[in-house]
Amino acid sequence: MSFTPTDYNAYDFANRRHIGPSPSEMEEMLRVVGVSSLDQLIEETVPASIRQETPLDWAPLAEHELLARMREVAGKNRVMTSLIGQGYYGTVTPPAIQRNILENPAWYTAYTPYQPEIAQGRLEALLNYQTMVADLTGLPVANASLLDEATAAAEAMTMAERASKSKARAFFVDADCHPQTISVIRTRAEPLGIEVIVGHPAQLVPEDVFGALFQYPGTYGLVRDFTRDIAALHEAKALAVVATDLLALCLLKEPGAMGADIAIGSSQRFGVPMGYGGPHAAFMSCKDDLKRSMPGRLVGVSVDARGNKAYRLALQTREQHIRREKATSNVCTAQALLAVMASFYAVFHGPRGLRAIAERVHLNTVRLATALKEAGARVSPEAFFDTITVEVGVGQAGILAAARHRGINLRKVGRDRVGISLDETTDAGVIARVLDAFGIHEPAPAKVGLGFPEPLLRETGYLSHPVFQMNRAESEMMRYMRRLSDRDLALDRAMIPLGSCTMKLNAAAEMMPITWPEFGTLHPFAPADQAAGYHEAIGDLAQRLCRITGYDAMSMQPNSGAQGEYAGLLTILAYHRARGEAERTICLIPVSAHGTNPASAQMAGMKVVVVKSAPNGDVDLEDFRDKAAAAGDRLAACMITYPSTHGVFEETVREVCRITHEHGGQVYIDGANMNAMVGLVQPGAIGGDVSHLNLHKTFAIPHGGGGPGMGPIGVKAHLAPYLPGHPEVTGPLTGGHDEAADEGPVSAAPYGSASILLISWAYCLMMGGEGLTQATRVAILNANYIAARLRGAYKVLFMGNRGRVAHECILDTRPFAEAGVTVDDIAKRLIDNGFHAPTMSWPVPGTLMVEPTESETKAEIDRFVAALLAIREEIRAVEEGEIAAGDSPLRHAPHTVEDLVADWDRKYPREQGCFPPGSFRVDKYWPPVGRVDNAWGDRNLVCTCPPVESYSIAAQ
């Protein structure tokens, strides 16, 4: 018997691990679709006129090869003790939180909790976060996180403008705010026509402004009471915003006690690594009468169908997916996973633990300041929490270098000062090394007093809710985290077929490096030579993304897709201004566009002109041509999504681009659907001038239950000089282009949430060029397979000229309304089958948009199809009068364990209700609550942890 070696490659990540269907399963699926090969399907789906000719050709790495490469790159970063401060601090991530939250796919693969019945665990964790923020800031309402502190400050400015009764058009910013915050505020204010006045609080003229931002503690350390300044603002009908620090508020008088209207800041130092800039969860809290103006998501308490307490996202009519250009913000992605980590940090330590950490940080700072003063150094300010500034004159460079030689980064302040910010990782050894850098060899004193006046000492309690008072044994913490995760449905349990969301595999090997200290401990403003590994990874990823998209330069700064849109539009406007065409402010946007598009355009100061859709779902070319002509030399841009939001490759995309360019506009191609294009179509080659990429969709960053995300923007060469810059960095921030960007920043850190860029880089490296292209092809196959399987039961709403969809398909459920069955009924019934619902009522009301991605196996897709076919039969029973819609399992869905064991008085069998076709019996997912009453929740708004008795007593 002769030996023949197998040709099976056990290390082929793309085809053996990432892509779901096997080659034999693909053949079966292709037969169902009605084609003989994947090549034929792509030819019938993607117009020949736009297909790219040059393939992506880099070789893939196996998982073990990737991790070796990552170790090599990580070794090029220098792990230092960074005492730079400026909003970023060393912290200790409790291993229990790292292991059970950050590294747990039950938490990091979940989607935004728009379906509350399957998100009760993370909604509770986010409610804990809101309670933590509300308690510490002394304001009654807090949201569930924003992108970063600087963005939160800009959001607070526009919120103050909306809510203030002052007629002024200026906003005052304390000069003691972090420099990156001031820069982001300026970027946001300019297109909105808001004047930004930067100065010291003594220079504030309240009558001249609609609001003011104070930093507490200040960026250079000053702690002062703003009560009088805030009262003066209120006299002038202006609002007060305080940028603050949660750890400092464990000791210091809270902003609410000073009369602040809004508080913002970052929760990074609550157990979240710096990560060279992120991701971290920013927070915002406000007075009760401002809650409807607050941006971002808000978790509230409601009841389910049985009257049991249930959590949900409240007041969603404020958000961009509903209000579009009239939304309070364009925020879509937040930082849910990082907010969850911060909330568990507070649960882990409790109020006494947090105060002990705050005291330790503060008293260490007092010891350091005292030792410096005793040695003759000039130290300021007189009142501080964790940050001091030392006047060093011409010796600045020498002291900074001496500190670096001892493994410590200090902050360069002006030409003659050095800033020092201590944190929870600071010990006596670190203090001794700092003193040594100043030539001081005497130890710091052991016994010291407060470093700020006693009237600034906090008098009120915080975190009194039982969740923050629980037994802090790790066994209890572990079980609490497990209980919450068991309430949720994430990718670790089932397919999440959300259209336009691309819930693909987030592979373990891609995730592992983000927790390594070589990546996690770097400060975003550390000297560049300490981050050589980061720069290599970011630069290589940027170049690969340029090859994928056909663009010439890539900015990695935007922290979300919506922020990428905003940055891209600002880039276009800056380009027009540089050409003397500042009057170009009109943006054409199809009516079917994602809600962030018009919201972003409005934020950029553009006038939105809506373009109709043709009956087949395409952009109405005649209407587009007319409106472009009407705009004429006022046309700034058009924003289109490709493939379209209807899930189709439109044949007319080149013509849309041509018309826009003919009238002097720029083409923004939204990259939300890039998962249908990688390796097949380059947006930069079909007429696009700028696109953002949702790395948390196409490039494998997990959704984290509602963030983090990343939205880098690619541009053609003529736009590269107008990409976002940053006040802390000189030289180019872009990949693929040598020209330095000098526009204002859109986020706090130069490279946004830099640490999670490693995930997308790892994905590109392991997939290889051919694997990325194959992933796109299989994503298109999976969507067409679902469309083919369901076509007889549901109408597939939009298809291309040859009857194909792209990577997603829209199922029309509107005809069922005549029988009283709603799209909500279908979505909730899918929960009984163990599935997250597809995207509901967008881009067409009353429809479901399904996107399976390339990562789902045929077996899982078939289970999903079986569930939808069974639901169709239940609808048919209603249509034919066998059962009323209100009595059907559709209306009573989802079914809970409480339903299963209760007396059964329903007009369908218990078996049908609780174990529908497609559901598991042994491993069945049981939602913890029944259908949530959204209207009740908005009428009875509670956005902090409810009293303990409500946990055992059903809501009245």
Swiss-Prot record:
Cofactor(s) demanded: pyridoxal 5'-phosphate
GO-annotated molecular function: glycine binding; glycine dehydrogenase (decarboxylating) activity; pyridoxal phosphate binding
Matching InterPro entries: GcvP (IPR003437), GDC-P_C (IPR049316), GDC-P_N (IPR049315), GDC_P (IPR020581), PyrdxlP-dep_Trfase (IPR015424), PyrdxlP-dep_Trfase_major (IPR015421), PyrdxlP-dep_Trfase_small (IPR015422)
UniProt keyword Lipoprotein, yes or no: no
Cystine crosslinks: none
EC number: 1.4.4.2
Taxonomic superkingdom: Bacteria
Catalytic activity: N(6)-[(R)-lipoyl]-L-lysyl-[glycine-cleavage complex H protein] + glycine + H(+) = N(6)-[(R)-S(8)-aminomethyldihydrolipoyl]-L-lysyl-[glycine-cleavage complex H protein] + CO2
Alphabetical UniProt keywords: Oxidoreductase, Pyridoxal phosphate
CDD domains: GDC-P (cd00613)
Entries under Pfam families matching the protein: GcvP2_C, GDC-P
SUPFAM superfamilies in the cross-refs: PLP-dependent transferases
Gene Ontology CC terms: cytosol; glycine cleavage complex
In-chain residues carrying the UniProt-annotated modification N6-(pyridoxal phosphate)lysine: 697
BP GO annotations: glycine decarboxylation via glycine cleavage system
Protein's job: The glycine cleavage system catalyzes the degradation of glycine. The P protein binds the alpha-amino group of glycine through its pyridoxal phosphate cofactor; CO(2) is released and the remaining methylamine moiety is then transferred to the lipoamide cofactor of the H protein.
Subunit structure: The glycine cleavage system is composed of four proteins: P, T, L and H.
Similarity remark: Belongs to the GcvP family.
NCBIfam families according to UniProt: gcvP, PRK04366.1
PANTHER family per the UniProt record, alphabetical: GLYCINE DEHYDROGENASE (DECARBOXYLATING), MITOCHONDRIAL, GLYCINE DEHYDROGENASE, DECARBOXYLATING
Protein name: Glycine dehydrogenase (decarboxylating)
